[in-house]
A protein has these predicted regions:
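A residue-level marker of the well-folded mature domains of exported/periplasmic proteins
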Residues: 1-205
């Protein structure tokens, strides 16, 4: 919203604006003439497909419900939201195709905008964590909260911020990994911290 006045002024002056990456949700109509970005919803779907391949057997073997954490740094950025929703909707689609019930809980934006109808006693719970402020500390705490839930089998991070927070949140708990009794960690983007975490097995990918 802070940019909207400037965008309107640029439009009125005939200055074309091209956005990159996240886009500008709520921008004055016609002020942003194009946006160069990943199809973030499709990217989230692809992440879900690859993740579900790894989780499928664990879900089948679980006697009770299983929880898949979804970490987003915010509920306002177009790229973050769509990567999260793409992941949520595709996991739900795949799980439902295998005969499981699915629900979404946590952040209201994701619960309301996902294609999943909330239901009680679901086999697969998609638990969305978004911090009140975008800080590494709060996101690491979100990760720890998810890791400390007994039914969590996976956590997905929708960008580098969330991925690095997963690594930090795991430091004392040491629950992330690819073993049957560990929590699978998958994330978007890369950087030194995430690359090293994939290399040493903390993150699956």
């Amino acid at each position: 919203d802070a940019c909207n006045d400037a965008l309107q002024q640029a439009k009125d002056a005939g200055i074309p604006i091209v956005g990159f990456d996240s886009g500008v949700p709520g921008a004055p109509e016609g002020s942003v003439v194009a946006n160069a970005a990943t199809d973030n919803y499709a990217a989230g779907e692809l992440a879900a497909e690859k993740t579900y391949e790894v989780l499928k057997d664990r879900i089948a073997k679980a006697k009770d419900s299983v929880r898949i954490g979804v970490m987003g740094q915010d509920a306002t950025s177009e790229s973050i939201i769509n990567r999260g929703l793409g992941f949520i909707d595709k996991i739900a689609e795949l799980a439902e195709a295998d005969g499981y019930t699915v629900t979404v809980e946590g952040n209201d934006k994701y619960v309301q905008d996902s294609k999943v109808e909330p239901t009680d006693d679901a086999k697969v719970i998609l638990d969305v964590a978004v911090p009140s402020q975008v800080t590494a500390e709060l996101s690491a705490t979100d990760c720890q909260t998810l890791l400390n839930k007994d039914d969590t089998i996976c956590i997905y991070g929708s960008n580098q911020h969330s991925g690095e927070a997963m690594v930090t949140g795991n430091e004392n708990l040491q629950k992330l990994g690819s073993g049957e009794d560990q929590v699978l960690g998958v994330t978007f983007d890369s950087g030194t911290v995430i690359k090293e975490a994939v290399k040493n097995g903390t993150l699956y990918g």
